[in-house]
């Protein structure tokens, strides 16, 4: 455990804490005012454990609090709307390291006096704070400042990122960590409230107390806190919402942000202007917090890659939820008091993105607190997770972010451990280097893309929610302004009505006065008349003159008064008219304002509905994200299986690749044949289609020519018939006029004859006979004329019948023409169907062209890829060839050297054998000592040379292939030869020769393998060049296909034009036929009328 230096870590944590505190004070511009007030805190611990410092909480108590003290709900004071919660600094290093270190190791950690200065917010009297804390904590021992009213009720216990890091690096700490997590997951551990002081903390006592009572605290917490939701059911909904877990950072310290809590009754009780002012203040404070967080996070985390996403999430969460909370307080009327506390710190864990809440296992049911929190709050909990690689730097940024607590949607409740594990597994596998196969990576990337897409959607939805909430706030402000204007207009209208009443009263009084004046004037006139009458009777005198002057003066005064009154009346009437106009304008304004108010209310309702819809959509998205996380888990399991399968498949793949190469060759041949056949089939189909189109166009032209000829003949016949009809009508009219004239003349003659006859009968009876004869003659002429008339009528009727027959023939011709028209229409419809087929074929060809283009692009890409691979293979081949040549030259040189050495050794061995034989031949004698000494000296020299050669050979073998089995260090070769070691040396040399020969064979085999690879590469090169040639041929064919497509388009357009012309001609023919029919009908009607008349 040399790497785990607790003192260094604690000092680093203290430095990070001090830096974070300085950055907070710098951002929030906190001056060091009244440190004694903030130093005072409540001793909140176990009775058995004595706190080392009287003014602060012992850090051991946050782990053991629930053994002795029941948690009480927070009691809100109705005096202040915003109540800032104390920001506490938790030195968790000693409690955190107690899980890993022994008490002796823990004692080395120095004392960490960590004091946090709160932001200087609205200060209240200490007595109220004392009373509120006495009610909330049931402890009346010491006082607290005004910011300690709201307490952290339910917060989930989170494992810091360094525990995971330590677990991965050392097996001991990993085992302990797993044991603790398993114990806490088997128990029903709900959210644990963390209470921490801000004063100086004695580390030694806390470490001992925590190490002794770590297991007892957890069991007691499970029992005490499991009973809390039953007691909290009577409370309000917002007071029962669980606060998010206090996150434990990597350095072992955490800061809970400043929280502003709104009291509902005080918001409702105050006026609209004050509510607007409060909302603007809260918005400005929220904006300041967000900007400070952005500055600090940007400065503190320069290496954090995904900081932008983190900032977006935090900004969207903070701003949207704050606006929603403010708007809900300003709009809704709540009867009960409720104070919601939210710790906006996010949780940090592991190397990747991970969240480790210690919670109930997936097999055990969920705790009651989670169910009650989910049932009553109905708000979705979100947690932001930051990697622990930059945990120390991030901590300074996070500690400096006083996030506004008015966020009901960012409540982090305790979630089941399987969900946390899914997030851990997912993000850990994202951060790990990609060692798996490309298929698994593609599946992972798809899942990541879907998650990122959903996150982007969520961000967009949150931004929309933000804009809608801002618009809602603006609309509410406008609504309040309009209400104020309404009240002002009502007051003005009431004042105007009062003025109107006053002026009407004045006018009535003036009218009464005018009426009285008129009456007085009338009376005065009567009196003047009477006086004048009296004066006329009496004599003129000075008295009458005086009386008249007085009366004139009275009359003038009355007239002046009447003029003044009339002027006043005019002025009053003008004022009344103006007031009425103003009243009408005010009424119009009031109506307009009412309409605006109604519209704004409707918009508000619509925006509320939209917000509800967006919330539902968000819920759906979160559910989808959960489902995707589960899917990711399944896919990861499948990945593990697939990796095993992949290993098996790779082995199979190697065996199949040889078969695939041959199959590829066959496939290329088949593709070539298929391409040739396809091109032939396409050409044949195109030729057939072109022939069919030409035939259809010829048939159309023929049909059009026949229709034109028939139309011309019909038009000629119609013209002839019209001329004949006109001639017959003219002749008949002439004959009728002539006959009428003759009938008139005859009737005149008859009348004259009758007159004469009467005269003659009266005058002379004798002259009657010739007259009678004349009459008879006249009657005979009349009969002849009538008979001639009848003949004429018969002729006319015959002619009428002929004309009718001609008409019937014309009707039959018309029917034939209509039938031909119908046939033409049928042909046109068939042409249209053919045209549609041609269009479909054209679209199909276009689709085929696009597919061919896509194929071409793909083939070009493949060609480029193959070319790149070819170049790489060529480079590799050249390199391998050069390497093999170099190795070959080296081996050849080594072989030659070895052969030379072997030859030298053989010569030396033969020389030694000869010397040994000579020595054996010579007998040992005393006289031969000088020769012996000489030979021994010679042999010693030779042996020394041999020894040096052997040593050099040993060194060369050491450098090249290995040490020789025989070493001649410290021994004379002559002695070795004398002892019979020459044969062993020769054997060693022979074995070395065999080794060298084996190496030569191995190198030759390698050369053969390389030549085989070269041949394979050459074959692949040939294949790729063939594919490239084919692709180039296809590319050359593309312009031909394009020209064919253009021709087809032109033909299609010409066919469409012809079709339009034919349709127009058919319509013209139909109109002409209708005109002819109408003409025939009118002529027949005229003839029938004439025949009837």
UniProtKB/Swiss-Prot annotation:
Phosphorylated by FER. Residues 333-342 are annotated as: Interaction with Elongin BC complex. The modification Phosphothreonine is found at residue 929. Induction: Down-regulated in malignant brain tumors. Residues 51-70, 139-158 have a biased composition (Polar residues). It is found in: Cytoplasm; Nucleus; Golgi apparatus membrane. The modification Phosphoserine is found at residues 72, 77, 112, 136, 199, 217, 328, 330, 333, 338, 344, 413, 542, 925, 928, 933. It holds the Pfam family TMF_DNA_bd. Residues 246-257, 925-939 have a biased composition (Low complexity). One of its GO terms (molecular function) is nuclear androgen receptor binding. Residues 123-137, 173-187, 229-238 have a biased composition (Basic and acidic residues). Residues 38-80, 108-189, 229-260, 266-285, 919-939 are annotated as: Disordered. The keyword Repressor applies. GO terms for cellular component: cytosol; endoplasmic reticulum; Golgi apparatus; Golgi membrane; nucleus. Keywords: Coiled coil, Cytoplasm, DNA-binding, Golgi apparatus, Membrane, Nucleus, Phosphoprotein, Repressor, Transcription, Transcription regulation. The keyword Cell cycle does not apply. Potential coactivator of the androgen receptor. Mediates STAT3 degradation. May play critical roles in two RAB6-dependent retrograde transport processes: one from endosomes to the Golgi and the other from the Golgi to the ER. This protein binds the HIV-1 TATA element and inhibits transcriptional activation by the TATA-binding protein (TBP). The Elongin BC complex binding domain is also known as BC-box with the consensus [APST]-L-x(3)-C-x(3)-[AILV]. Interacts with TRNP1; may regulate TRNP1 proteasomal degradation. Component of the SNF/SWI transcription factor complexes. Interacts with RAB6A. Interacts with STAT3 and FER. Interacts with TCEB1. This is TATA element modulatory factor. It comes from Homo sapiens (Human). The gene is TMF1.
């Amino acid at each position: 455990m040399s790497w785990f230096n607790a003192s260094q870590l604690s000092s680093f944590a203290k430095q990070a804490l001090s830096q974070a505190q300085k950055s907070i004070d710098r951002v929030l511009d906190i001056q060091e005012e009244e440190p004694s007030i903030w130093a005072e805190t409540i001793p909140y611990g176990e009775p058995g454990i004595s706190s080392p410092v009287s003014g602060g909480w012992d850090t051991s108590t946050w782990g053991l609090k629930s053994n002795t003290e029941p948690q009480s709900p927070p009691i809100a004071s109705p005096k202040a709307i915003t109540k800032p919660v104390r920001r506490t600094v938790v030195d968790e290093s000693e409690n955190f390291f107690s899980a890993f270190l022994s008490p002796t190791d823990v004692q080395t950690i120095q004392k960490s006096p960590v004091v946090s200065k709160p932001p200087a917010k609205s200060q209240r009297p200490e007595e109220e704070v004392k009373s509120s804390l006495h009610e909330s904590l049931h402890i009346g021992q010491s006082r607290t400042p005004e910011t300690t009213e709201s307490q952290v009720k339910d917060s989930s216990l989170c494992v810091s990122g360094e525990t995971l890091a330590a677990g991965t690096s050392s097996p001991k700490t990993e085992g302990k960590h797993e044991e603790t997590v398993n114990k806490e997951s088997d128990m029903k551990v709900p959210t644990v409230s963390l209470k921490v002081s801000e004063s100086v903390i004695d580390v030694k006592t806390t470490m001992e107390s925590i190490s002794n009572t770590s297991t007892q605290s957890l069991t007691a917490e499970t029992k005490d806190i499991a009973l809390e939701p039953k007691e909290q059911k009577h409370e309000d909904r917002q007071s029962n919402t669980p606060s998010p877990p206090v996150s434990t950072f990597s350095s072992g310290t955490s800061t809970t942000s400043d929280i502003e809590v709104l009291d509902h009754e005080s918001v409702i009780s105050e006026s609209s202007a004050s509510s607007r002012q409060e909302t603007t203040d809260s918005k400005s404070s929220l904006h300041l917090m967000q900007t400070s967080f952005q500055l600090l996070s940007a400065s503190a985390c320069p290496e954090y890659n995904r900081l932008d996403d983190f900032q977006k999430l935090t900004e969207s969460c903070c701003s949207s939820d704050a606006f929603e909370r403010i708007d809900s307080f300003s709009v809704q009327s709540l009867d009960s008091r409720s104070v919601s506390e939210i710790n906006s710190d996010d949780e940090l864990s592991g190397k990747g993105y991970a969240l480790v809440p210690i919670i109930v296992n997936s097999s055990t049911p969920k705790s009651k607190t989670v169910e009650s929190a989910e049932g009553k709050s109905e708000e979705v909990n979100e947690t932001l997770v930051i990697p622990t690689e930059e945990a120390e730097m991030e901590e300074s940024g996070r500690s400096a972010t006083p996030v506004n607590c008015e966020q009901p949607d960012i409540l982090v409740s305790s979630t089941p451990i399987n969900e946390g594990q899914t997030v851990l597994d997912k993000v850990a596998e994202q951060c790990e280097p990609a060692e798996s196969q490309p298929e698994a990576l593609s599946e992972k990337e798809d899942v990541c893309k879907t998650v990122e897409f959903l996150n982007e959607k969520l961000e967009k939805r949150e931004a929309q929610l933000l804009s809608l909430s801002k618009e809602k706030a603006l609309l509410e402000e406008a609504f309040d302004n309009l209400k104020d204007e309404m009240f002002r207009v009502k007051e003005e209208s009431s004042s105007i009505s009062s003025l109107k009443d006053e002026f009407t009263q004045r006018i009535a009084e003036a009218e009464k006065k005018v009426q009285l004046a008129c009456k007085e004037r009338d009376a005065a006139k009567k009196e003047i008349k009477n006086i004048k009458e009296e004066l006329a009777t009496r004599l003129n005198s000075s008295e009458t003159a005086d009386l008249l002057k007085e009366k004139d003066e009275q009359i003038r005064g009355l007239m002046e008064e009447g003029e003044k009154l009339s002027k006043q009346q005019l002025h009053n009437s003008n004022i009344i008219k103006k007031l009425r106009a103003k009243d009408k304008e005010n009424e119009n304004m009031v109506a307009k304002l009412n309409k605006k108010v109604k519209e704004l209310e409707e918009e508000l309702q619509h925006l509320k509905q939209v917000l509800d819809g967006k919330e539902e959509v968000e819920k759906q998205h979160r559910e989808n994200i959960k489902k995707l996380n589960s899917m990711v888990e399944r896919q990861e399991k499948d990945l593990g299986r697939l990796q095993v399968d992949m290993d098996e498949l790779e082995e199979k793949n190697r065996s199949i690749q040889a078969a695939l190469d041959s199959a590829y060759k066959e496939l290329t041949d088949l593709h070539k044949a298929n391409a040739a056949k396809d091109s032939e089939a396409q050409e044949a189909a195109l030729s057939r289609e072109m022939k069919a189109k030409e035939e259809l166009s010829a048939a159309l032209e023929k049909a059009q020519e026949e229709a034109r000829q028939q139309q011309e003949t019909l038009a000629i016949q119609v013209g002839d018939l019209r001329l004949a009809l006109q001639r017959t009508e003219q002749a008949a009219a002439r004959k009728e006029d002539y006959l009428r004239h003759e009938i008139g003349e005859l009737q005149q003659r008859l009348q004259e004859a009758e007159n004469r006859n009467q005269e003659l009968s009266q005058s002379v009876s004798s002259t009657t006979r010739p007259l009678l004869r004349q009459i008879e003659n006249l009657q005979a002429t009349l009969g002849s004329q009538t008979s001639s008339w009848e003949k004429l009528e018969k002729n006319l009727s015959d002619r009428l019948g002929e004309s009718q027959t001609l008409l019937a023939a014309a009707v039959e011709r018309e029917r034939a023409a209509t039938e031909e028209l119908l046939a033409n229409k049928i042909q046109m419809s068939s042409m249209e169907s053919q045209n549609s087929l041609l269009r479909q074929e054209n679209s199909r060809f276009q689709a085929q062209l696009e597919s061919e283009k896509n194929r071409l692009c793909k083939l070009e890409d493949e060609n480029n890829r193959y070319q790149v691979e070819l170049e790489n293979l060529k480079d590799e081949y050249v390199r391998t060839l050069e390497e093999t040549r170099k190795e070959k030259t080296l081996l050849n040189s080594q072989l030659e050297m070895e052969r030379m050495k072997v030859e030298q050794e053989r010569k030396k061995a033969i020389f030694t054998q000869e010397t040994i034989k000579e020595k054996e031949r010579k007998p040992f004698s005393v006289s031969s000592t000088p020769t012996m000494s000489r030979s021994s000296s010679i042999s010693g020299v030779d042996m020394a040379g041999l020894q040096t050669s052997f040593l050099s050979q040993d060194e060369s073998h050491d450098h090249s292939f290995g040490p020789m089995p025989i070493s001649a260090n410290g021994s004379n070769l002559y002695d070795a030869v004398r002892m019979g070691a020459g044969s062993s040396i020769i054997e060693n040399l022979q074995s070395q020769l065999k080794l060298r020969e084996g190496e030569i064979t191995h190198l030759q085999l390698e050369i053969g393998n390389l030549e085989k690879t070269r041949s394979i590469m050459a074959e692949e090169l040939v294949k790729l060049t063939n594919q490239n040639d084919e692709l180039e041929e296809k590319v050359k064919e593309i312009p031909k296909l394009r020209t064919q497509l253009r021709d087809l388009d032109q033909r299609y357009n010409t066919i469409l034009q012809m079709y339009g012309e034919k349709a127009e001609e058919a319509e013209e023919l139909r109109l002409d036929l209708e005109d002819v029919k109408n003409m025939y009908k009118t002529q027949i009607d005229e003839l029938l009328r004439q025949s009837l008349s």
